[in-house]
Amino acid sequence: MQEHWANLNGLKIRYLESGKGNDKHILFIHGLGSSADRWVGIPKSLSANFHTISLDLPGFGESDKPASMNYTIENFSDIVIDFMNLLAINDGKTSIVGHSLGGYIAAEVTILHKIQVERLVLIDSSGMLEKPTALLEEYLSVAMNPTTDKVRNIFEQMVTDSTKIPLKLVESFIKRINLPNAKYAFKSTLENSTNTQLERERLKLIDGIPTLIIWGNEDKVIPVEHSDLFKESISNSHVEIIQDAGHAPFTEKPEQVFELIRNFLT
């Protein structure tokens, strides 16, 4: 994957790209507190047949983190749409893969600009939470005062296999959350994304876009029952439950999730 930077009206956005020249595109949108690097090689593996792009959302990873920004789903969605326009992946041949917060944003982008989206993949997506779950509240507390032990502990609660939490991941999170304005961006994003919901009627606007819903059966961040809420609201959708996986099944069962995404998008 090649690292690039996009300039969106003065906002610097970092992204990773592979497979440029392929006719169809896949845009990967990460979750809260994560980055473009967290997709464990799936974008690279798919780049044999697709032009794949994973971005650092503003406020996260290495992208800019303006203190003046209100980190709402609406603002994230507008930025993603501007990003798609800038990279000329707005030709209706782009599929979007969103995890957690990224799933909420991906759904909103699809609703607002349906003509630009070919297929949609939602992985343990937020958007249906009426309030933060206990684990999300703990995640916020840890992010505001991170230590190696605290971060490792919260990450281990999000997976079924603690060996999937390498020290490098913990250290990377601590480094990035201590960057200027990163804690504000994290808190603002969490509050905004859990104080608003994707209404069922609004989700129905995705109708006609083939949608794959993937969920870890042991998700303690957003319970697996939420997969049914999305399926019931999006007519052309189906659900795949990943056994023995938590909130980020693509990190615990990468081969299985890769196959599901590849088969769905091919």
Set out the residue ranges of the language-model regions:
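Alpha/beta-hydrolase fold catalytic core
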Residues: M1-I26, A48-F50, N85, I89, ...
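Conserved alpha/beta-hydrolase catalytic His-Asp/Glu region
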Residues: I13, E130-T133, P146-G208
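Active-site loop/oxyanion-hole signature of alpha/beta-hydrolase fold enzymes
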Residues: L16, S54-V97, L101, E259
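Short beta-strand/loop motif that positions the catalytic acidic residue
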Residues: I213-W215
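Catalytic active-site module of serine/aspartate enzymes centered on a nucleophile-bearing elbow/loop
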Residues: S237-T266
